[in-house]
Every structure is written in C-alpha cells, then in structure tokens.
C-alpha cells in the first residue's frame, strides 16, 4: 500500500477503535471483520492490531462467552503477531495472551476433538517462556505476568461448584480421561514455572523492577491457589538481601534498591501471614523471619538527607555541661557495638551489657522459643528477690528518664559572642531535687520515697428509673431482632440442639445458634420473673416485666416465619416448660416479700404459637406433625387445637395423621 493509503486506512481503524471504546459490546463483531489487518506487511498495522486485541480482551464489559468464542478465532492471529520482531508488538501480544490462555484452555477442556487448537496454544506458551529464559529485558515483566496466569490455569482450583466462578479456569476443569490434555504433566510444568520466577530473586543481579514484579504476583497466586502457599512462603523465607556492609563499594543507588526491596518483601510476607492459605507453622516462620530483620546494617544517613557542606560555627549551638553529660552516661550504660543493638531502640533501653561482655555478641534469636521460655522461667524462680526488684527499679527509672527528660538546671557554657541581653531561664529547684533524688534512689536500688500517686475513682453512675431501664432494654432487643432476617433458615440445627448449652458456647464466635440459647433463657432465667407488687395492686394483670416483653418480641419473630424457626420455638417452649416445673415443685422460691410470680407460661405461649400456625397449614404439612411431637408436654388445650384441625375440611387428613403420629411415636400421649 502507498503511504497515503496506509494513513487513511489507519484513520478508519482508529475510528473503529473509538466506536469500541464507546460501546465495548461491539468488540466481537468488529474484530472479526478486521482480523485480516494483522496480515498486512506494514508494521504499523501489526502494532495497531496487537494493541486493539489487548484492549478488547481486557475489557470487563465484553461477556465471558463472547470472549471464549473470540479467543479461539483470534489464536492463530496472535501467534503470527508474536513472530514479528518488534518489542512493542510482542508486549501487547503477551498482555493479550494473559487473557487468551485460560479461555482457550477452557475451550480445549470442553472440546476433546480440537487438538489443533491445543497445539497452537502450547506453541504460543513455549515461545513466551523461551523469551523469559533468554532474559529478554524489555519483555521480562510481561513474561512474568503471563507465567503467573499459566500457573493459575495449570494448578487445581476450587472444586466446589457453588464457590467457583466461570471465569476462574484451572486444572480442575480438565476431565479425567481427556485425550490430549495430561493433568499431571501440566501440574509439573506449573511447579517448574514457579521455580523459574523465583530464579529472578536468587539471581546475582539486583534489579528492583523485576524483583518487585515477582513479589507482586505472589499474593495473587496464594489467594487463588491456596495449595501453593507453603511452596511460595518457603521460597520467600530462603530469600535474603545482600548486606550492604559486606559490599564496601556498593553505590547509593544499590543501597536504595535494597531498602525498596526490603520494604516490599516485608509487606508481602505480612500479607501472606494474614491470608487463609498460610498454615500456623508458616505464620510463625514469617514472624521469626521479620523479627530477625532482613539485614542488620543501618543504611547510611547520606541516603536520608544531604549533609550540610558549610562550616559549622562553634557559636551556633550550646554545648552540654560535663555534669549533664556524666549523668546521661550513667543513665544510659555503654552498649555493645553489635549491629542488632544499634538498630533496635528497645534493646538500647533494656540491654545493659558493656562492649567487652561476650553476651553482647550472642544472637538470642537463634535459641528456640521453647528452650528460651524454660530458661527464663527457671531463672525467675532462682533469682534473688531483692536483686530482681533492684534491677526492675533501675529499668523503670531508665525508661522514665528517656521518655520524660527533665531539665536539670545545671550551669551551661555560654559563648562569648552571645548577646549580652540574654537572660537564662529560671531554675526550678523542686525539679532539680526530684531528679537528684530519683538518681540516688536508682543507684541505691530502691524506688523514690516521695513518689505520690493520686487515687482516681470513677464517679458513681446515677440510678436509672424503671421507665429508662425499659426504654434501653427495648432498644437493645429491637436492634437484635433487626438482624433476625439475616439468620435465615433454622436458628439451631437439629444435630447441635441437644449438645448446645451456655457452658460450651465458643466466645470467639457469636452467631445465630448462640442467640437461640440466650433468648429463651432471658425469658425464663436470665431476667427476673418477678414483678414488684405495690400495696395497691391485687392482681398481676396490670404489671409488666422485662421477661414478658422478651416473650412478646420472640413470639412476633417466630410467628412471622414459623417454618424456619421451628427449632427456636421448641427450644423456647422447652425452657418455659422446665421453668414452670421448677417453680411449681419449689413453691418456697416465690414467696418472698413484695414479689409475685407471673404464673405458668408454657401452655399460654404454646397455644399462642399454635394459633399463629394454624392459618398457614397445608394439607400435607409434615413439619406441623413433627413440631407437635417435639413439644415437651401435650396438655388438654393443645390436644383440643389438634382436634380443631380435624374439623377443618381442608385439613382433616392432616389432623388425623398428626394424632396417628403422636400415638405411634409419643406413647405418653393420651
């Protein structure tokens, strides 16, 4: 084509791309019509086509099914574009292949007769991996991303069909007896690819860009393929940055690169420690790795700020007096020159070894935690109590002196060139005396005698009125039942109903099963079942208790959807029945002065629940039959309710089936 004709053609292609940007759903139709553009000899067509394919397949607005069909159609074109000797074209093709590979892989899994497509896909994969092995630097980052997509595809994913999404393509999609896809070979290849990307971390050259690219894909691999977590975490823990102190001629740029990689590595390890795929042993190893620091050499201060090049005048600052300097030296004993002591500010407070002490150069982190714990406990049992308290007081005073430095008010050397009008600050004699006394007490190993701590007491809260208590209680119960629709289905599963008690409730998890225990207990034993009786009251009809309020709220909830709350109703009525039996068998427990028992509650609320159920019964409602058989007691009034069901022409069969069921499986029923 002539130059003018090529430019005109590219202009029309750009217009087509603008249309796709406006409405990305048109991408499949347009790309099929212009796919032959990639065969033109002009390199500008190939660049445009590679970029357009990458743009279209990376769009989230194109449906997955359309991408799946289009990926197979464009596969040959993508392979031909990757053969072009142009870095820009290859980068776009590799980026496009990150989306193409899992799509074509899924097509091959569901099409056992299309082996030619699988061969073409394998050819594309091998060519990209070969460029990675050659160390083609302009393409290396794109190759790392593509290899991560291949690993995700060739490793088994989530097998539960309820959790997996259709866009998550993994080795689990491959049928057991596939004619040309061997799952074992692909899985071994995925493990080899993991070793390939980790080879960048362990290479001799320190390239921040490539190492960061590898580190950034690792959390994605662990999140989507949890079985890779042990291998990835283990390889990361074997990675150690070079020590800048060992490389005397290390440039500032290399030192900054090490700091950048160290920061990124720490973030990645912390993220992996919080991920669900990491085991407890892996988490412990990660924390031990981080606590030991990646390298123990402090980076030069020249990397943080530029040094002042001018001459520093002696008159620009005041020099500390010898008395102040000697006091600081006594309060901060000389530390070892070990790198760990210099880098860790906490060690500078707690450690008191001198530089010549051999313990200063001993790495405590090399001792296992169990052995260190046993040593500490044994030492604490055998140490002299007075000496122990003396050291504690010294440590307490050292921490206080470092965290709250006080002005000692000692003489300071004033430069001769200082302004004659300068007036020194007033000396606080009390502050000096307190500081001197604390220093003397520290040296004697005893705490200061005049340290007075003011006792602090919280004010007694005002007592709430009965109406205020009722209002707050109503608000708490209302918030609880606002979340009731989230419970869904059964509040308590039948398998856990017998063994679920307040004693074996796990405090770390508070869910619908625990509310099923708490609410019935609030009605019966959790809240007071007694109502204060005034001298003018003769009956309890006008009285109102908190337990009756909970019963009303609970009844309103279960009546709205009784089928999904059957177990909760049975649990509640069983608690009411048990409480009534205890109260009736022990009449002395409710004969206290100024209190009155509300009376039996089981039959009252059981009848209310049954009345709310009856209008919603069906002709063959087996849930009702099982519910009646599980009631703790069948009173005459409850049996009359079943008789009422027998009199209903639409539910006669249900009523007699219920009686038959009770006679067969509930022998005590009359």
Curated annotation (Swiss-Prot):
It is found in: Nucleus. Component of the cleavage and polyadenylation factor (CPF) complex, which is composed of cft1, cft2, ysh1, pta1, swd2, pfs2, dis2, yth1, ssu72, and fip1. InterPro entries: ARM-like, Symplekin/Pta1, Symplekin/Pta1_N. Pfam families: SYMPK_PTA1_N. One of its GO terms (cellular component) is nucleus. GO terms for biological process: co-transcriptional mRNA 3'-end processing, cleavage and polyadenylation pathway; tRNA processing. Transmembrane segments: none annotated. This is mRNA cleavage and polyadenylation specificity factor complex subunit pta1. To yeast PTA1. Its main location: nucleus. Component of the cleavage and polyadenylation factor (CPF) complex, which plays a key role in polyadenylation-dependent pre-mRNA 3'-end formation and cooperates with cleavage factors including the CFIA complex and NAB4/CFIB. Keywords: mRNA processing, Nucleus. The gene is pta1.
């Amino acid at each position: 084509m002539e130059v003018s004709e090529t430019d005109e053609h590219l202009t029309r292609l750009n217009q087509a791309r603008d249309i796709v940007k406006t409405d990305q759903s048109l991408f499949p139709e347009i790309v099929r019509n212009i796919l032959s553009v990639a065969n033109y000899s002009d390199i500008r067509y190939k660049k445009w086509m590679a970029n357009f394919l990458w743009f279209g397949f990376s769009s989230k607005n194109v449906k997955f099914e359309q991408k799946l069909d289009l990926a197979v159609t464009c596969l040959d074109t993508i392979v031909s574009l990757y053969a072009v000797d142009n870095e820009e074209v290859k980068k776009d093709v590799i980026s496009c292949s990150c989306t193409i590979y899992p799509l074509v892989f899924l097509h091959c899994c569901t099409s056992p007769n299309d082996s030619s497509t699988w061969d073409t896909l394998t050819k594309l994969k091998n060519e990209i991996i070969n460029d990675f092995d050659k160390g083609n630097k302009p393409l290396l980052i794109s190759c790392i991303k593509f290899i991560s997509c291949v690993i995700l595809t060739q490793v088994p994913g989530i097998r539960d069909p309820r959790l997996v999404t259709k866009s998550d393509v993994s080795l689990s999609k491959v049928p057991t007896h596939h004619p040309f896809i061997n799952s074992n070979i692909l899985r071994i290849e995925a493990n080899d690819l993991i070793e390939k990307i980790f080879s960048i971390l362990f290479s001799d050259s320190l390239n921040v860009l490539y190492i960061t690219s590898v580190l950034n894909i690792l959390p994605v691999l662990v999140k989507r393929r949890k079985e890779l977590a042990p291998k990835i975490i283990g390889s990361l823990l074997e990675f150690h940055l070079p020590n800048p102190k060992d490389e005397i001629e290390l440039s500032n740029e290399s030192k900054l690169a090490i700091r950048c990689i160290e920061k990124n590595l720490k973030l990645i390890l912390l993220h992996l420690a919080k991920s669900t795929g990491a085991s407890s042993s892996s988490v412990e190893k990660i924390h031990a790795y981080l606590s030991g620091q990646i390298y123990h050499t402090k980076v030069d201060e020249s990397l943080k700020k530029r040094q002042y090049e001018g001459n520093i005048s002696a008159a620009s600052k005041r020099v500390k007096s010898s008395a102040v300097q000697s006091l600081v030296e006594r309060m901060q004993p000389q530390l070892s020159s070990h790198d760990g002591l210099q880098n860790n500010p906490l060690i500078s407070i707690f450690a008191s070894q001198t530089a010549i002490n051999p313990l200063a150069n001993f790495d405590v982190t090399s001792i296992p935690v169990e052995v260190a714990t046993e040593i500490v406990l044994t030492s604490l049992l055998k140490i002299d109590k007075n000496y122990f308290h003396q050291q504690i007081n010294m440590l307490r005073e050292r921490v206080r002196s470092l965290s709250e430095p006080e002005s000692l008010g000692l003489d300071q050397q004033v430069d001769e060139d200082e302004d004659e009008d300068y007036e020194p600050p007033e000396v606080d004699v009390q502050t000096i005396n307190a500081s001197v006394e604390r220093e003397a007490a520290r040296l004697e190993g005893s705490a200061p005698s005049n340290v007075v701590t003011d006792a602090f007491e919280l004010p007694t809260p005002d007592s709430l009125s009965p109406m205020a208590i009722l209002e707050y209680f109503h608000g708490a119960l209302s918030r609880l039942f606002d979340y009731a629709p989230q419970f869904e289905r059964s509040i308590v599963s039948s398998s856990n109903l017998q063994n679920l008690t307040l004693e074996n409730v796990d405090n770390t998890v508070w869910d619908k099963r625990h509310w099923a225990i708490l609410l019935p207990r609030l009605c019966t034993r959790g809240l007071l079942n007694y109502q204060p009786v005034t001298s003018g009251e003769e009956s309890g009809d006008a009285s109102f208790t908190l337990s009756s309020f909970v019963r009303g709220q609970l009844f309103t909830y279960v009546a709205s959807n009784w089928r999904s709350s059957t177990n909760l109703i049975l649990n509640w009525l069983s608690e009411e029945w048990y409480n009534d039996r205890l109260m009736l068998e022990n009449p002395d427990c409710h004969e206290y002065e100024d209190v009155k028992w509300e009376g039996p509650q089981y039959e009252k609320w059981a009848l209310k629940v049954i009345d709310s159920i009856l209008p919603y019964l069906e002709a063959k409602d087996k849930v009702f039959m099982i519910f009646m058989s599980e009631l703790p007691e069948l009173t005459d009034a409850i049996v009359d309710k079943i008789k009422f069901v027998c009199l209903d022409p639409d539910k006669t069969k249900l009523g007699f089936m219920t009686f038959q069921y009770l006679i067969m499986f509930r022998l005590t029923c009359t």
